[in-house]
From Swiss-Prot:
Gene (UniProt): phoE
Organism listed in the record: Bacillus subtilis (strain 168)
Key words of the record: Hydrolase
Recorded family membership: Belongs to the phosphoglycerate mutase family. GpmB subfamily.
Listed GO CC annotations: cytoplasm
Residues the record lists as binding substrate: R8, N15, Q21, R58, H139
Name of the protein: Uncharacterized phosphatase PhoE
Length: 193
């Protein structure tokens, strides 16, 4: 069985400002760095084999901070980058809502493209690290899309907002992925249930 813990990156200033980040390469803020340390402190008590990360700064830095506690190889994979939001990138929520009330942004990566990319990435991880325990540091919409696909569109999961630096655990056994738990955030100071 391959076990994967999906870690959402720590907070950025754009998260606070409710700006659409997508593929825009925004760094962690001080809170995000603290969240990454708290995550590292929490996951160090479990056995891991490797860390896979999106190459975007906010995910990569989260992975590096977590790795201060684990001392593992880190592998970057483009498959786990955030969704490309096209013309909406950098736009605050209020402006996006006014301009695009249907949440469909010009030049945006489709949900099908995103899901195919992410599931392809998971397949590569499973092939490269069979029966291993893998931390994957990625992004909110990316993790949400993976969980939605694996769950078959579970309505409760679809309505859940994944908090920064939350953990979601999935495993591959009997030729399929399944969700163990998601949006775990009790390790974060000031966590939200």
């Amino acid at each position: 069985m391959t076990a994967v813990c999906l870690v959402r990156h720590g907070e950025t200033d754009w998260n606070l400002q409710q700006k659409c980040q997508g593929k825009t390469d925004i760094p962690l803020n001080a809170t995000g760095e603290r969240q990454a340390r708290e995550t590292g402190e929490y996951v160090k008590d479990f056995s891991w084999d490797i860390i896979v990360t999106s190459p975007l700064k906010r995910a990569k830095r989260t992975a590096e901070i977590i790795n201060e506690y684990l001392h593992l190889p880190i592998v970057e994979m483009d498959d786990f980058k955030e969704r490309d939001y096209g013309d909406a990138e950098g736009m605050p929520l209020e402006e996006r809502t006014k301009r695009y009330p249907d949440n469909i942004y010009p030049n945006m990566e489709t949900l099908e493209e995103l899901t195919d990319r992410l599931m392809g990435g998971l397949a590569k991880v499973n092939q490269a690290y069979p029966n291993k325990k893998v931390l994957i540091v990625a992004h909110g919409a990316a993790i949400h899309a993976l969980l939605t696909e694996i769950s078959g569109g579970d309505p409760e999961l679809q309505s859940t907002r994944l908090v920064n630096a939350c953990l979601s655990n999935i495993e591959f056994a009997e030729e399929k992925w399944r969700i163990k738990d998601y949006n775990i955030n009790s390790h974060l100071s000031g966590f939200i249930k």
